[in-house]
Amino acid sequence: MGEDTDTRKINHSFLRDHSYVTEADVISTVEFNHTGELLATGDKGGRVVIFQREPESKNAPHSQGEYDVYSTFQSHEPEFDYLKSLEIEEKINKIKWLPQQNAAHSLLSTNDKTIKLWKITERDKRPEGYNLKDEEGKLKDLSTVTSLQVPVLKPMDLMVEVSPRRTFANGHTYHINSISVNSDCETYMSADDLRINLWHLAITDRSFNIVDIKPANMEDLTEVITASEFHPHHCNLFVYSSSKGSLRLCDMRAAALCDKHSKLFEEPEDPSNRSFFSEIISSVSDVKFSHSGRYMLTRDYLTVKVWDLNMEARPIETYQVHDYLRSKLCSLYESDCIFDKFECAWNGSDSVIMTGAYNNFFRMFDRNTKRDVTLEASRESSKPRAVLKPRRVCVGGKRRRDDISVDSLDFTKKILHTAWHPAENIIAIAATNNLYIFQDKVNSDMH
């Protein structure tokens, strides 16, 4: 990053509608697969759209890094819980890719209650020349069969097939907020407000409850689970975050029920900063292990923090995302914006972190140089192949020409969901119903 931030450019954006936004079109999750060749998005209408990276060609060297629609399918439908008289939204809360084992790809998608496993396969050949069936698959009249032939495979237009493999239901009383695939490639966990369940990918009718923070009396409830994730290398370790701002690292080798954590990561509160909003803004909305497994990244309302697994007392790094909003917490509380759940992401080398903000802004922080940049994802400022200009929010006093004042920020335009390519400087940004894909100009010019 550093000097290179000004040369970050947009490749293209996927715009679903130019005139108005329907609620169903709003993107609710973004996820690269383990190679970065595929990118999946889920929306509030229960749809999953998969994008595939274009192969680099000699004729069009600038196409390197571009993504095209690969497949679209309906993952979840709206349902109704007759026992509780509750509607279950079709909105896709999370998508997680499984490590690729063969030519097919697999992913998990979840709404509030049900997790589904999908298999994505390609077909570019079809069998022809059957002896007992015609081209449409109907049985021939045997009296007309005078000779035998060997069936052959003929090329055909590429067809992407998405098929449901398994449905994991009835595991959660409360709304599922996160799913995470284990490094053993056989199990995954799902978390709701009060419980975390461990599933085997091959078994749909039962799961093991590994965390349960539900008190005997619900009036004694003081915190809820907000996010959880498995360690990238140690299949026995996982972390979950809470609405009180704490992180609990658990070891499944210690006990079947991990109510007693191995480590508690919590930053002591500064009494001088105590206010009515302190607990709300300290709630962790996302937690991500670094690729190395040494660090954890958390996002609360105003900051992103980096934690070392070997130091529980406080984070080793704290970055202010939009500290200028501290004076506006009252109005943000009244509009419910203070409860927005922003995600965070690491780059492939764990040296840069990214998270979203309001006004379609997103922030990047370089951990080595300590430099940061604010960029904007919008149709107005982002033409294909245009260089993204850093933006600056002005709190008061003198304003530069391109500065934007805090009072003119649009809080309906928010970047909640972001993803970073696992190896390259390619990022995906969800802005309401638009998906933007950016890549580093320096990175692309090297090829």
Curated annotation (Swiss-Prot):
WD repeats lie at residues 22-61, 87-128, 171-209, 220-260, 279-317, 334-375, 410-446. One of its GO terms (cellular component) is protein phosphatase type 2A complex. Keywords: Repeat, WD repeat. GO terms for molecular function: protein phosphatase regulator activity. The B regulatory subunit might modulate substrate selectivity and catalytic activity, and might also direct the localization of the catalytic enzyme to a particular subcellular compartment. PP2A consists of a common heterodimeric core enzyme, composed of a 36 kDa catalytic subunit (subunit C) and a 65 kDa constant regulatory subunit (PR65 or subunit A), that associates with a variety of regulatory subunits. Proteins that associate with the core dimer include three families of regulatory subunits B (the R2/B/PR55/B55, R3/B''/PR72/PR130/PR59 and R5/B'/B56 families), the 48 kDa variable regulatory subunit, viral proteins, and cell signaling molecules. Interacts with IER5. Belongs to the phosphatase 2A regulatory subunit B family. This is Serine/threonine-protein phosphatase 2A 55 kDa regulatory subunit B gamma isoform. The gene is Ppp2r2c.
